[in-house]
Amino acid sequence: MLGAECPKPCKGKWPTPPFDPRFPNQNQTRNCYQNFLDYHRCIKTMNRRGKSTQPCEYYFRVYHSLCPISWVQRWKEQIKDGTFAGKI
């Protein structure tokens, strides 16, 4: 399983996330949140199927590039406490 803080290839060059046609506007708040959800859904699904979580790394990199650290920390605390509003 990829670590919640940093997957295996944490070091190195992280390119800017590519354009996502679902979020064409300059404000990338929704893009950040959606990639956070997609990452956690991907991890959950891959673990359930007993497969490698390596494909989930893309979502991890995107949300870590777009989201403020304080948001990510708060969302992780909410997931841990069972109060996160998103559907994972």
From Swiss-Prot:
Q: List the disulfide bonds.
A: 32-67, 42-56
InterPro entries for the chain? COX6B-like, CX6/COA6-like_sf, Cyt_c_oxidase_su6B
List the SUPFAM superfamilies.
Answer: Cytochrome c oxidase subunit h (SSF47694)
The keyword Membrane is assigned to this record: yes
Keyword field: Disulfide bond, Membrane, Mitochondrion, Mitochondrion inner membrane
Taxonomically, the superkingdom here is: Eukaryota
Tissue specificity annotation: Testis specific.
Q: Name one GO biological process term.
A: oxidative phosphorylation
Describe its partners and assembly state: Component of the cytochrome c oxidase (complex IV, CIV), a multisubunit enzyme composed of 14 subunits. The complex is composed of a catalytic core of 3 subunits MT-CO1, MT-CO2 and MT-CO3, encoded in the mitochondrial DNA, and 11 supernumerary subunits COX4I1 (or COX4I2), COX5A, COX5B, COX6A2 (or COX6A1), COX6B1 (or COX6B2), COX6C, COX7A1 (or COX7A2), COX7B, COX7C, COX8B and NDUFA4, which are encoded in the nuclear genome.
Protein name from the UniProt record:
Cytochrome c oxidase subunit 6B2
- The species is Bos taurus
